[in-house]
């Protein structure tokens, strides 16, 4: 829900803003607006939004559930891109373990293109996440350079948990040891890794392809 709106009258007129009822509206100078907007090209309006808090108890389990485990991912832009892809590919929940980045970083929110506010995100310790997944019979697939199988050679069984690791180190030893199946994306021309958000999109859409078309 939107709690407050800040706007710069030199960029946008108040009458052009669709303001929700009971929302505090504050006019600010161009100087102040530039300080709080974090970028030069904006629409002239900034909202303070209260985000829902989620816990693992609120994750409803069904036979088409996909959960992402983001294990120590550091770059805000990558997390934001993953949130966007997750919304597009029907991911239910994102669990963050080994936290290295504040999910409220402006670059996370900006690069998610609104998906930040639509995605269930929870923080868990590794052991807590594993216990939850095992209890609810998730099949745990980990994206790993050490995998023997490629993502195309796997028939994905729901409910699914997909683990993606940090940009520099990949998944942690914990998830290397506790995943059910490790998968990788084949690459040519001496390239040994892809951006984590790209890897996430590739594997998620293969799961969607199998689920929707049975191919």
What is each PLM-predicted segment?
Residues 4-8, 26, 58-147:
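RNA substrate-binding interface of SAM-dependent RNA methyltransferases
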Residues 38-40, 44-64:
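Acidic/glycine-rich phosphate/pyrophosphate-binding loops and surrounding catalytic core
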Residues 13, 31-36, 127-131, 148-150, ...:
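A short acidic, often aromatic-flanked loop/helix-cap motif at beta-alpha or helix-coil junctions
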Residues 10-11, 30-33, 99-101, 167-169, ...:
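Short, acidic/turn-prone active-site loops that include or flank metal/cofactor-
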Residues 85-89, 103-116, 173-215:
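Structured adenosyl-cofactor binding patch, chiefly the S-adenosyl-L-methionine
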